[in-house]
Design a protein with these regions (language model features):
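Cytochrome P450 core scaffold surrounding the K-helix E-X-X-R motif
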Residues: 128-133
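Short acidic-hydrophobic, aromatic-tinged amphipathic segments that line or gate anion-handling sites
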Residues: 143-147
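Short glycine/proline- and charge-enriched loop/turn segments
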Residues: 66-70, 137, 199-206
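Short, conserved phosphate/pyrophosphate- and ester-handling motifs at nucleotide-, phospho-/glycolipid
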Residues: 37, 139, 171
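ALDH superfamily catalytic-core signature
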Residues: 1-126, 148-150, 155, 189
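Conserved glycine-rich beta-strand-loop-beta hairpin in the small C-terminal domain of fold type I
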Residues: 69-72, 114-117, 134-140, 159-163
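Short beta-strand->loop structural element characteristic of the AMP-binding/adenylate-forming
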Residues: 1, 141-142
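C-terminal core of ALDH-fold dehydrogenases
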Residues: 45, 105-123, 149-206
Length: 206
């Protein structure tokens, strides 16, 4: 998910959270990699985004006490999935990325044996790191900053996966350029996750 300098910040923050942490990140098009273009927008978004990630409520979705929560996250699907996500978080730390939000070690009352993880966010991520290249399939997002839209498109096109990507901008030229040049099965403009037509194949072909 690419964020340009003219993006509407509140819309970006809301959709970063819902697209990254909905279904505990267990979606083939979850926004796991965020690229901001320009230092100004990066510095504006980062603190708000980190706080929004921390504010995600992790709980038993069947608990009536959390029925009115706007952003509620349940468990990952299995103990194996939880361990894989935790191992990937540890890998990111060892690779030198900064773990700005750490979702490990979370315990949900009444579900002590559940496979729950909180939200995790990495900053200072570099192309080539495993946390950038591997599909983690869990509640983990990475955010990185580049200078130009061309740089962001290059990151997309060099990535091993290409199921879906999005651009946040109010600029029609940037939107058209992104639509033409980004190599991805589905491309969205000002949406968190491009909506697939479910009865047609969407295998992430570049």
């Amino acid at each position: 998910l690419v964020v340009m300098e003219d993006a509407k910040v509140d819309d970006v923050i809301r959709n970063l959270i819902t697209s990254g942490y909905g279904c505990a990140g267990q979606r083939c098009m979850a926004s796991s990699v965020i690229v901001t273009v320009g230092k100004k927008i990066h510095d504006e978004i980062l603190p708000k985004y980190l706080q929004a990630a921390k504010d995600v409520v992790v709980a038993n979705p069947l608990d009536p006490a959390v029925a009115d929560e706007q952003m509620l996250m349940g468990p990952v699907i299995s103990a194996q999935a939880k361990k894989f996500v935790e191992d990937m978080i540890e890998t990111g730390v060892k690779e030198g990325a900064t773990l700005a939000v750490d979702g490990r070690g979370l315990v949900v009352p009444g579900c002590e044996n559940g496979h729950f993880l909180g939200t995790s966010v990495f900053t200072d991520v570099k192309v080539g790191m495993d946390i950038h290249n591997v599909e983690i399939f869990g509640p983990v997002q990475s955010i990185m900053n580049v200078d130009t839209l061309d740089d962001a498109i290059q990151i997309i096109n060099d990535h091993p996966y290409g199921n879906g990507c999005s651009l946040y901008t109010q600029n029609g030229y940037w939107a058209r350029k992104f639509k033409i040049e980004a190599q991805s099965g589905m491309i969205g403009i000002n949406v968190g996750i491009p909506a697939p037509v479910a009865y047609l194949p969407f295998g992430g072909m570049k």
